[in-house]
Amino acid sequence: HTMPGFNDSGAHITNMAFFDANLNSLKLAQRKSLETVSKMVKRLTSEPAAFFGLDVGTLELGDQADITMIDPEVLRAWDDKGGRELIYRDLFEHPQMVSRSDGVVTHTFIRGEKVWQNGDFGEALGKQTLGRALRAA
């Protein structure tokens, strides 16, 4: 038994862009069935949270409600290898390998607050504390 895990998340900014493993997992599941997508969502959310003893990963009443919404048609057409490019980041004064998935993720919510919608940041982002440090139970 294994747990999905390798997501670079931009830590290796020059030469790696493998932070789209979750989207690729959902795309593979999508090819099979809606039931397989449902199982994959569970594998990517509540199962890792339970393994690490975190009170997140589900949408039960009173939960934190971190949600990412994905357009299934855009995901189906998305080419993960075609979206990789090397760009220059002024912030880091360094080139960075990125993997574009424009349009796949349509909305992101942290604690129920919209922080991303179709390429635009939400008003709450950077102005109020939305998330929290997660510590194992």
Predicted regions and their residues:
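Active-site microenvironment of metallo-dependent hydrolases
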Residues: 1-137
